Amino acid sequence: MKRYILTTLFALVLFAGSAFATGHIPQNDGKSEVETYIKKVAKIKSDEIDYAYISSSMFRQMFNMLGADVQSELNDIPLQLTSIRSMRQFTATGPEGYKQLSQAMDIFLQEEESVMGMKLMALNREDGTMTAIYGDSNSTLVINDEGDELNVVFIAGLSYESFKALGESGMEIGF
């Protein structure tokens, strides 16, 4: 059963930018160009909130177009890029350079108090599913384990307190 997490306008992200419709991913030769592209095709701007969403297949396709030197740079900043769906499948088939986020998942599954420098703010277990929310004053990371599917949403520029306030105001997203 799909569960909903209260937060910002996630559903609109799926329709943000022509790249989602065309599947076109431009050639990039630098980290800043990759980040610019992601922001162009997958950003919702609401006040000061930047929300980036990239599917695992799109990220893998884009990652594979980059040179080894750029892949190495991106290895240091995976969470700045993205939100990933079906993480288990992606970590099994994804590029070596995305290992850090896989390690974050391992930490999560052991229920550590922090992931990637963000503190565990909320943990909910219900009927074999688990949702954990990590955050700090700059970002929020939501990990939703449905048992057969693991969803990860990273929201850059949205503090945990703002995330919580949006939820309390009734905005919702569905994974």
Q: What do these predicted regions represent?
A:
Residues T131-Y160:
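A short, solvent-exposed beta-edge/loop patch
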Residues G94-Q103, S139-L141, L150-N151:
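Short, surface-exposed beta-strand/loop "edge" segments at domain boundaries and coil↔beta transitions
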Residues V41, F108-E112, G170:
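Hydrophobic, Leu/Ile/Phe/Ala-enriched alpha-helical segments that form helix-helix packing faces
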Residues I25-S102:
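Early exported N-terminus immediately downstream of N-terminal targeting peptides
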Residues G157-F175:
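Surface-exposed amphipathic alpha-helical segments
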Residues M1-Q27:
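Bacterial Sec-dependent N-terminal signal peptides
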Residues S102-G135:
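Short Gly/Thr-rich strand-loop-strand
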